[in-house]
C-alpha cells in the first residue's frame, strides 16, 4: 500500500534527523539564523529539496548551547503558513543512540495541538 510506504519513509526521515540532512537532494541554506521562541534561543537551519526528493520547506531548530535538535517545522507553502511544527521532548537511548522520546505536533497556522508520538523500548 502506498500510504504505508509513505509513512515508513517519513518516519525513517524523522528518526534519522539531523543526519538525514546529509542525504542527496537536500539543499541547506548557507546562512544559519538566530531565533528566540518562548524564551528559548535556537540556531535555525533552513532546508529545501530537489524536486525529485520533495517540495516542502523545513526549518530545524538547534539548542544554542548544546546544539541538540529541539524542534522542526515544515511548510508545503510557506506563504500560506500551512504545515506543522514538531517539538522534541525527553530522550531515550536506543542501542546506544539518543532518540527523542516524545514528538508533539502542532499546526503552524494556529498553534493547535495535533498529537504526540511516544517512543518506547521494551
PLM regions and their residue ranges:
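Flexible, processing/modification-adjacent segments and terminal tails
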Residues: 1-56, 76-82
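Gly/Pro-enriched, hydrophobic low-complexity segments
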Residues: 41-122
